[in-house]
Amino acid sequence: MATEEMREKSLKREAESLWDIPPESYASKACSCMGTAAQLVMVAVLGSFQFGFNLSALNTSKAFIILDFGWCKDENGGHYSDCDTGLVYGSLINTAVFLGACVGCLLGGRLTDFGRRASLIFTHCVCTLGCILSAAAEGFPTLLIARLVVGVAVGMFTVCVPMYLSEVTPDDRRGYFGTFHQLFITLGIFFGTLLGLAFGNAPAGDEVYEVSTFQQAWWRVMLGLPAVVSLLAIWLLWFVFPFETPQYMVEKKQRAKATALLREIYGRDNVDVEIQRIVTSRYQQKIQRAQQLTVWKAIVHPTYRSVILLACLLSIMQQFTGINVLVANSNNLYSSLKLPQDAVTGLTVGFTALNVFLTVITIPLVDRLGRRTLLLFSEAVMFVAMGIAFVANLVDQSNTAVQWVTVACVYVFIVGFAVGYGPVLWIYIHEIFPPEIKQGAASLASALNWVATVAIVLPSDFLLKQGFSVFVGICTVALAIIFVVTFIFVKETKGLSIEESPYFKGKSRALGSPSAFRMELNSSPSVPLTRGEGAAASAEKGMGLTDAAAMNGGRGVSDDLTKGTEVV
């Protein structure tokens, strides 16, 4: 009887997948306390958690990996963690995640063309493979390859998760749900460092240290644990939520399914306008693709050049503030200050906990205070914090008071970063580009951000070995430069469309303005919504592409996909 019932359910699911037949409900009945959109968001941000966890997991475990593999040995065969070989190998495995992410973020856009849900499943599979290989590594080569694979998954998550979120959430709550991506990144970072407390006191670099059996096993558990999260996500996406986003359904001519899902997402029966927006967005994207300027042509065009260079500079300099050194290498940073070893991991956990807290409370500030204001405030706070730390360490780094003042400055730094430069950058670089260069220019800025991350994280062990003042001096200079650039060149975009943007006011663009684009749409025939009532409603109202474009502010639905996203 049970077998027959399972067979019937299997046949029903197969029929639904082959034909445009919506299921009875898209939401999981096991979690009736949450709406459909909230359930889908919580599943998607498991990828965001993986992003954060894998960036920070090596922070607390790297020293024990060096000891376990015996990369540093004295003449008596004793293991310690501070030698040239350990420094090089440790830096490379730490940076491998960021290097892999450079590749992954470039692959992510292509991957989503095969389906938003499918792209998440594939990325979680890659992440699972990388984490299992990390846990099973037997030496430097295998661990390096494993961390590169994990990095590719991290890079793909930066593209796939925001896109999925933007397409399964209501328009009026997209900003709210979009911040869950950044929130779960910071939660992943927090738990990645929190689990490091189980190691006990961090070993001093020149101390001969015998790694316990528990410590030998625990670093493997930490690097392999994300595989469990990914397997859970794969199971949920495969069996509990086995459907694509409304946008992808419409693209695959599954209008009835898309309509049914949108009704659950919005909590109302009439979603004709939402379906029309999706159809309109697809037409817009087709026209924009046909008219798309390559980023290289745009750079030599006088109208676009300065904006692209500004976005790239903002993106690169975000990493030269030192933020990802604090995320990925803070244990070494605190050790370079000669702080007590029993306080090092605790300080790292406190730092990441503060990051989570600030991410939660800063969510509404971006729209209230404006982009330029927050950037300037953020950069000023970070500059003052790093400047004080730099001067104090130049005077007397060995002084206990100076050491704790430096720790306080690091904590003030994260306050400044979390309320401005962190989240605002990713909103800003997706607001200042017009449609004809947006995809290429934003991708270039994002890729350069990852390249800059590699450039600052890779040598961070060597810089910190020379003393904290060298590292903090570089960050202070970078912050001074970017504050001046922001003050002179960055213009406020809060509440403005591209048509009103001060960057293009009075300038001739290669493809004209959104007004011209709407005129082009005006000549297009009305697009039917769905078979049945949607099409009838459209015919009755006479809603064409131009009407829906106006309702959507002249933007495609997917334009908001990366707003509110931060890469730390």
UniProtKB/Swiss-Prot annotation:
Alpha-D-glucose binds at Q182, Q318, Q319, N324, W426. The chain crosses the membrane at residues 33-53, 87-107, 120-140, 143-163, 183-203, 221-241, 307-327, 346-366, 375-395, 407-427, 444-464, 470-490. Disruption phenotype: Reduced growth rates. Attenuated glucose uptake. Reduced parasite motility in minimal media that does not contain glucose. No significant effects on parasite motility in minimal media supplemented with glutamine. No significant effects on virulence in mice. InterPro entries: GLUT, MFS_dom, MFS_sugar_transport-like, MFS_trans_sf, Sugar/inositol_transpt, Sugar_transporter_CS. Disulfide bonds join C72-C83. Inhibited by cytochalasin B. GO terms for cellular component: plasma membrane. Residues 1-32, 108-119, 164-182, 242-306, 367-374, 428-443, 491-568 are cytoplasmic. Residues 54-86, 141-142, 204-220, 328-345, 396-406, 465-469 are extracellular. Belongs to the major facilitator superfamily. Sugar transporter (TC 2.A.1.1) family. NCBIfam families: SP (TIGR00879). PANTHER family: FACILITATED GLUCOSE TRANSPORTER PROTEIN 1, SOLUTE CARRIER FAMILY 2. This is Hexose transporter 1. It comes from Toxoplasma gondii. The gene is GT1.
